[in-house]
Amino acid sequence: MITKLLTKVIGSRNDRTLRRLRKIVKEINNYEPTFEALSDEQLKAKTVEFRQRLEQGETLDQLLPEAFATVREASKRVYGMRHFDVQLIGGMVLNAGQIAEMRTGEGKTLTATLPAYLNALAGKGVHIVTVNDYLAKRDAETNRPLFEFLGMTVGINVPNMPHPAKKEAYQADILYGTNNEFGFDYLRDNMAFRNEDRVQRERFFAVVDEVDSILIDEARTPLIISGPAEDSSELYTRINALIPLLQKQDKEDSEEYRGDGHYTVDEKSKQVHLTETGQEFVEELMVKNGLMEEGDTLYSPTNISLLHHVNAALRAHVLFEKNVDYIVNEDGEVVIVDEHTGRTMPGRRWSEGLHQAVEAKEGVKIQNENQTLASITFQNYFRLYEKLSGMTGTADTEAFEFQSIYGLETVVIPTNKPMIRNDMPDVVYRTEAEKFAAIIEDIKARVEKGQPVLVGTVSIEKSELLSNALKKAKIKHNVLNAKFHEKEAEIVAEAGKPGAVTIATNMAGRGTDIVLGGSWQAKVESMANPTQEQIDEIKAEWKLVHDQVLESGGLHIIGTERHESRRIDNQLRGRSGRQGDAGSSRFYLSMEDSLLRIFTSDRMAALIQSGMEEGEAIESKMLSRSIEKAQRKVEGRNFDIRKQLLEYDDVANDQRKVVYELRDELMSVDDISDMIEHNRVDVLQGVIDEYIPPQSLEDMWDLEGLQERLKNDFDIDAPVKQWLEEDDKLYEEALREKVIDTAVEVYKAKEEVVGAQVLRNFEKSVMLQTLDTLWKEHLAAMDHLRQGIHLRGYAQKNPKQEYKRESFELFEGLLETLKSDVVMILSKVRVQQQEEVERMEAQRRAQAEEAARRAQAQHASAQSQLADDSDEGHHQPVVRDERKVGRNEPCPCGSGKKYKQCHGQIN
């Protein structure tokens, strides 16, 4: 009550922010007459002036009013477009490192030019991040004339660019690119072997377009660069043949109930589980097919990889549907469909062997499983930027998540003109067939009066179902889904014409405005060298059509189903009513829709259906509230999943930072001999401690063991026993020093033979290669640990704390192994000449380039990344067939030493 009263009196936080920014808008507007009087040359010279003032100590915030006024004036001269006051406010919000919620059609692309120009003055580069290549190229080419007029360079960062072109693009003042490509470049740079192979500069300022799509919808998708693991394609095919023999069971087994089905499906968490009967049946089938020995079980350690294949095949058949979750393209490849945008994602593959299982199910060529070489989530990549900001039409529903995870405040920017779109209440039908019949009738009525219609569907399958129904009704229409995405811009340009009907999956076409009356620019672009007279004629024709569409009611939006997220529904609605245009929207639902079926209570469903007749619809506030409640529930669960993923990934992220900082250090210096020397002393001290325990009696010393170890592991002839016999004054500390001095002398002798420079290059090469190999193995070990950590909860332990503790132990082990491996390799290697070092470097570089070419974002399903929800990890590059030997257990070789002090040092 008091809070509401205070808000009325002093305004909300958003209102107060806008009041403060409007004062600066006045300041910018005051510069307008002065800047209008400047010649083009004087206006261009402002960039040089601003850079000089920055060098003299002025801040970007102090320059902001003049810089924004400069961009506005340049835009008027280059495009004939003047930034609205609300766009200036949006630009200031972005410059402050916040999220600007701007409605569709309010000119986000032009708004981004303001903070991009201002921050580019610092000379550190500005990254403008888009969701796909088309938007990156379009926005870069659209804004290039403006930035070049002001003396700024513009670059584009898209996949498959030649290395020199990519490196040059990163030197541009303002760089447009996709989120995937920026993330992959970061990972590739941290696999590079020489400084000149890297492309990225420091990460200074990023403006993320469609920020909700990138930082929330894709937050659960790690970017992974992977290399091929062992080939097991035949096994996928053989296990795939068994899955159709399994029967679904509706209810989980319990103490009171044991069903006769083989698996159960949990639709809420999108998981599938074998029942006890199912496990026994699968084991019988495995034995019959020669995949398992008689009497063996799926859950024995040696069969873990078989269990992994069965789970993957079962999920592929039961949970993943063709034309909904993926399509099979003309080349016979399984291509993932993004559940949020409805776009295909070529090059991305599901992990955990799921992609191979789907390939086996569809009978196409099975590609090898992959092993992770480098990985990062978008959450952690974008947090590397000194300043991060974003734009979207719908961020307010996720404002809490932006604030808690990224520290980004959301500011809702007012529209330039009042919004007059009519959002009608939802209507609910009993069945999907009745719902589609009502949609067809609505479309017919609107087409007859010349009103354009955009129909949003949740999957390719539903869009094709509706398309077939429209064909039967003889209604002309366009389909915009993952199968036709290359025609996207063309279809969107036509979607605002009188009577046009467009079916789009989710947010396909997002980022491109639907202009009422169609796009006159598209018509001009299709003409060869049009005259000004022809352009004016096209504009006049368009104006007549535009007014006709406005009279018919503007663009009408039909939602065929509610999405799990209110934000996606709002995005669909937001396609209509741009720039104060007329428009309307309505969602048609049925009790068979996924959201209502899964999340509406049985009582509510029975209540609704009891009084309904065929073809009858109901509109009810209670039902709308119930649907919104279900959506909030799903959003809350998805937020918890993302938050939990981040908490686990933060552990790996801290380790990633240490490894990448070490790599940076190694690559930035030519001579690491001091580091090698320090490591040699550390490693040898540790080895000597094992055989001559500190402050121990001579009777406890194992001198023969020490001599043998020094010879085998470090190629050092140190007759320790003989030294002691010859010099009875040689005590423990002096003996240690003598062993280390001998090792140093042996290494120096090697240096004299091959030359200091050759050895320096070789040291660096060995250190980098060993670090990369160990890091790759460490990522696999971390995955392995992550997959089973939730089971610790059953032992009354906190899985997160256990994960932190054990991953820290693994990481300590990595650093120790790195030291010992490098010292052992350098001690035993015989470098002949410079050519060998160069050959090794070339080989290592070729491997890194090949891995980089194979870069792929593996789509990890949200559920498989939940620690305490599932026993499947978020990808499974390596499955161990034998039990792992503990570091402190006796070594299997029979030496009597601990594993970590014997063969564990080699492995």
From Swiss-Prot:
What UniProt keywords apply to this chain's record, in alphabetical order?
ATP-binding, Cell inner membrane, Cell membrane, Cytoplasm, Membrane, Metal-binding, Nucleotide-binding, Protein transport, Translocase, Translocation, Transport, Zinc
Q: Where is the composition biased (Low complexity)?
A: 854-865
**Biological process terms in GO annotation:** intracellular protein transmembrane transport; protein import; protein targeting; protein transport by the Sec complex
GO annotation, cellular component aspect: cell envelope Sec protein transport complex; cytosol; plasma membrane
Q: Where is this region: Disordered?
A: 841-907
Tell me the compartments it is located in: Cell inner membrane; Cytoplasm
TM stretches of this protein: none
Q: Which family does it belong to?
A: Belongs to the SecA family.
What's the name of the protein? Answer: Protein translocase subunit SecA
**From which organism does this entry originate?**
Vibrio vulnificus (strain YJ016)
